[in-house]
């Protein structure tokens, strides 16, 4: 519900001044809407004299192109976000399956590496005892540091030891096999 003219007044102005300015502001709002209707009527009649700006470039055509570009950009963003959301959901669903499948392989490799490191630790301690007593060279397994560097997790899990389905090539791990042969 709109206030009546009598209700509109300002403390610093008389009622007649307030009413007059209110009428002007209300009439501005009314005429503002009619401009859009006139433009549509001109367009419907085929009167396109206002379609060009002073440079001769079509302003309505520019507006349509700008709107089209904006819509294309919005559509592109929505498609991209939908793709990203779908990919994330798929990864979440399959992450547990992949973990369950590869866990036993990783655990087996970890146990083998742990045994090799334990042997290297024992051999390193024995080598140190032999060196202290006789100055001898010791075991072929090498030092603990050498074994730890060679059997680092990033080297053990290098893709060159796995096929496309992340299974061990030929059922054996080349690096671990090499160190197992050294320890025997």
Curated annotation (Swiss-Prot):
Keyword Cytoplasm on entry: yes
Region feature (deca-GX3 motif): 82-122
Membrane-crossing segments per the record: none
GO cellular component, one term: nucleus
Oligomer and partners: May form a complex with LTO1.
Protein name: Protein YAE1
Keywords (A to Z) from UniProt: Cytoplasm, Nucleus
Organism: Lodderomyces elongisporus (strain ATCC 11503 / CBS 2605 / JCM 1781 / NBRC 1676 / NRRL YB-4239) (Yeast)
Any one GO BP annotation for this protein: protein maturation
Biased composition regions of type Polar residues, renumbered to the chain: 12-25, 59-68
Keyword Nucleus: yes
Subcellular location: Cytoplasm; Nucleus
Region called Disordered, residue ranges: 1-68
Function of the protein: The complex LTO1:YAE1 may function as a target specific adapter that probably recruits apo-RPLI1 to the cytosolic iron-sulfur protein assembly (CIA) complex machinery. May be required for biogenesis of the large ribosomal subunit and initiation of translation.
Residue ranges with Acidic residues bias: 29-42
Family: Belongs to the YAE1 family.
Matches recorded under InterPro entries: Essential_protein_Yae1_N
Predominant place of localization: cytoplasm
Comp. bias intervals (Basic and acidic residues): 43-54
Pfam families, alphabetized: Yae1_N
Gene that produces this protein: YAE1
Source superkingdom: Eukaryota
